[in-house]
A protein has these predicted regions:
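Short glycine/serine/threonine-rich phosphate/pyrophosphate-binding segments
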Residues: 12, 69-76, 96-99
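Helix-loop module immediately N-terminal to the HCX5R catalytic loop
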Residues: 40-52
Length: 158
């Protein structure tokens, strides 16, 4: 599986550590920038190339994007067809009778293919835990989830 990664200055340091870790685990990682720390860079410059690649192969590739909060990054990524970007800040379990972490649900139910991380809210350890959980959780393939995703893909904006 190809993993495309992009980040602005706010996530640059964590991005570099993430790339190293994922490569050591055997993943094919394609860095879409930033390639150096620049506090004046703009996240769309690095998110758009990731989203563009994942949009071309939404079921065979994944993307990880980092920014200060991950919110703007996800908004930009979700402009692309077939991209299902989700924001995450670390472990979160519901208060109801369910033990599933939200990041697990994003894969099982929504087949998320881009993970947008708020770098200001992660340690290196918590980021790696979240990324590994996301990468290793398969889409359930349940008919109801396939049907819902097809409805989303079929939305036409006039």
């Amino acid at each position: 599986m190809k993993i495309y990664i992009g980040s602005d200055h706010a996530g640059y340091v964590l991005k570099e550590k993430l790339i190293s870790s994922l490569k050591s685990q055997g993943y094919e990682v394609i860095d879409k920038g930033a390639f150096k720390y620049d506090e004046n860079d703009d996240y769309p410059d690095f998110v758009v190339p990731v989203a563009r690649e994942v949009s071309k192969d939404p079921n065979g590739s994944r993307g990880i994007i980092l920014g200060g909060t991950g919110e703007g990054e996800a908004i930009a990524a979700n402009k692309f067809p077939h991209v299902r970007a989700v924001v995450n800040y670390g472990k979160a379990t519901p208060v109801v009778d369910d033990e599933s972490d939200i990041i697990v649900r994003s894969r099982q139910h929504n087949n998320s293919n881009i993970l947008s991380l708020g770098a200001r809210y992660f340690t290196e350890e918590s980021m790696m835990e979240t990324v590994n959980l996301w990468l290793n959780t398969p889409f359930s393939g349940d008919e109801r989830h396939i049907r819902r995703l097809a409805k989303i893909d079929g939305i036409k904006i006039d």
